[in-house]
A protein has these predicted regions:
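Auxiliary alpha/beta "docking" domains used to position bulky ligands
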Residues: 1-536
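Active/binding-pocket-proximal capping segment
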Residues: 536, 554-567
Length: 577
């Protein structure tokens, strides 16, 4: 979301919108608010709604779980607790967050149930993952236990966190690349809301208090009533609205036994002031072009990093940095941190995110439809880019996927036969404020990584499912289960250049504050060219990062050839750090 006013001194829990400036009232009559209706993930043939349905069902299937019997030490003040949870939701990109008390009338007489949950729950109980990612066994065991346990009583839940996710604008008439996303605005926002509510409910349970997520497709409570009671929406007699969200929104909530501080409901007189509504980055740009002016970058035929492609060897998944740590190649200290995924589980926010990340592994590579639909490569690329940006990806690039970009063997040692020759690289922005506030070796750093990895796993998985529905093979390569080397593909697709800080690809608009993911496919696509924005000349002359690096990991020397690539290498003695 673009910045509306300076937030240098604005606390994160206050959110990006100045809702504190809106008039409030002490209480509100909820009897006039219409009952919530379930959102069905149904749409015309070819719509992205169908591809989103399975991922929405997965989030609905894991919305509840086992509560940690040991309660953590948290602030005793309900206001401090509320601010913490609001900040977490804002960090997860919730547009608005509100809190209200949960009243008996807020419970649905007939709870809403996603009809696809039963199928997903059976998959969680019976399917086996192929990945050996650290801690995947613990995640899958937890998920199996959760879906095998019937939902318990929630009458002891006294409070609700309510989230609103702004809907993007509707595609313009004849806008290129938008055939898949027409009519999917609410479904897209509901999916993102489901992600946040599922993560925060799990987070509260990890702290030792019972909590359950409620979405537009599966809910035990009336989200419309909660939205009005928490100040997230106003019922104007016709529609639920918020003064700052002119395109509408989708709702999600977390009910909990944890005591929180309720917000005051909005007064019916609340109106939009000039310049305060959400500014849509796509108001004057097509979805296929992205929010950033990528079209202004200088395009070149070859990446600025030399690649000796005939001599680039394929390496096994066992050579992956996380695998090396897990198997003890980098010393006993790092092996201990990697055991069971402890480096993620030691912080509750990242542990909460990793649960959903593990669940999506089962959805990464679905079978293609039996009938293949012909789509021109240029049209297919526009459809994929527009859909990805519409869903919330921050940057998308398309390139060939050479055989040397694939691992030679998977985590189990089985040979990998490259099935796809096309790569769709995607980037999730980790956020300037988050990067600025983290030391890189704290719980913030882990949570910001897991947030970005989870977001790609969700959105990349949806795009892969859409391609599979057209009859082409596709796979989302995530941090939990990937079979390709991503940095070279980012270079080929024009995301950025290699800098002195190592193998991280630096983007001219996002810098290094990004996490990437790749969807590979055999669907013919039009490719993007690599870019050259002067990074190589700049890094050769600057050396400031090498001088200031506290661990000495960044070297000041020239590039060296390694595995067929010309790179500036990280100091080997500092790799365990």
């Amino acid at each position: 979301m673009p910045r509306i006013f300076s937030n240098r001194n604005r606390p994160l829990h206050a959110g990006a919108l100045p809702t504190e400036r809106l008039p409030k009232q002490r209480s509100v009559d909820l009897r006039a608010v219409p009952a919530m209706r379930a959102l069905r993930f149904e749409g015309p043939e070819g719509s992205i709604i169908h591809a989103m349905a399975e991922h929405q069902a997965m989030l609905d299937a894991i919305r509840d779980g086992v509560t940690n019997p040991a309660q953590s030490e948290i602030p005793a003040d309900p206001a401090a607790r509320t601010d913490h949870l609001k900040a977490f939701a804002t960090f997860c990109d919730a547009t608005l967050v509100g809190v209200c008390s949960l009243e008996p009338g807020d419970h649905l007489v007939n709870p809403i149930q996603n009809p696809e949950v039963a199928t997903i729950a059976e998959a969680l109980r019976t399917r086996q993952t192929k990945t050996l990612a650290a801690g995947i066994d613990l995640i899958m065991a937890d998920l199996k236990e959760s879906v095998s346990t019937p939902p318990g009583d929630m009458t002891h839940h006294q409070f609700a966190l309510v989230f609103a996710y702004a809907q993007p604008r509707a595609p313009r008439l004849a806008e290129a690349g938008t055939d898949w996303i027409k009519g999917a605005e609410r479904h897209r926002s509901a999916l993102l809301g489901a992600e946040t509510s599922t993560v925060l409910a799990n987070y509260i349970r990890l702290l030792g208090w019972d909590a359950r997520a409620h979405t537009e497709t599966t809910s035990d409570v009336d989200l419309n009533r909660l939205a009005v009671a928490s100040g997230v929406a106003i019922w104007d007699g016709v529609v639920l609205r918020h003064p700052f969200l002119p395109n509408g929104f989708a709702l999600a909530a977390v009910t909990t036994a944890l005591e929180l501080r309720p917000d005051a409901p909005l007064a019916s007189s609340a109106v939009t002031a000039p310049g305060q509504a959400v500014r849509d980055p796509y108001a004057r740009r097509d979805f296929k072009d992205g929010a950033h002016p990528f079209e202004t970058l200088k395009r070149v035929d070859q990446p600025t990093t030399y690649m000796d492609e005939p001599n680039i060897p394929r390496v096994p998944k066992r050579a992956d940095l996380f695998a090396r740590a897990q198997f003890g190649d980098m010393g006993p200290a790092l092996q201990k941190e990697a055991t069971g995924g402890y480096y993620v589980r030691k912080a509750a926010p990242s542990a909460a995110q990793r649960r959903a990340l593990g669940a999506f592994v089962l959805l990464q590579d679905g079978a293609p439809a039996p009938v293949q639909q012909a789509v021109a490569p240029r049209t297919a690329s526009e459809l994929i880019k527009a859909t990805s940006y519409f869903l919330g990806v921050d940057a998308v690039g398309i390139s060939r996927c050479p055989e040397w970009a694939w691992y030679s063997h998977d985590a189990r040692g089985a040979p990998i036969d490259p099935l796809h020759d096309q790569a769709i690289s995607m980037v999730i922005d980790q956020g300037y404020e988050t990067m600025e506030g983290s030391s890189g070796d704290d719980w913030i750093a882990v949570a910001q990584s897991m947030r970005a990895y989870l977001r790609f796993s969700l959105l990349g998985g949806v795009v892969a499912a859409q391609i599979s529905a057209l009859g082409y093979s596709a796979k989302a390569h995530t941090v939990m289960d990937g079979e390709v080397l991503q940095p070279p593909l980012l270079l080929l697709s024009g995301f950025g250049e290699v800098s002195r800080i190592g193998e991280v690809i630096l983007n001219p608009f996002l810098g290094p504050r990004l996490k990437s993911g790749v969807v590979t496919t055999d669907m013919p696509l039009a490719h993007d060219q690599p870019i050259d924005f002067g990074m190589q000349y700049f890094c050769a002359a600057c050396n400031k990062c090498a001088r200031k690096c506290p661990s000495g990991a960044i070297t000041a020397g020239p590039k060296r050839m390694f595995n067929g690539l010309s790179l500036i290498h990280i100091s080997e003695p500092t790799r365990p750090y």
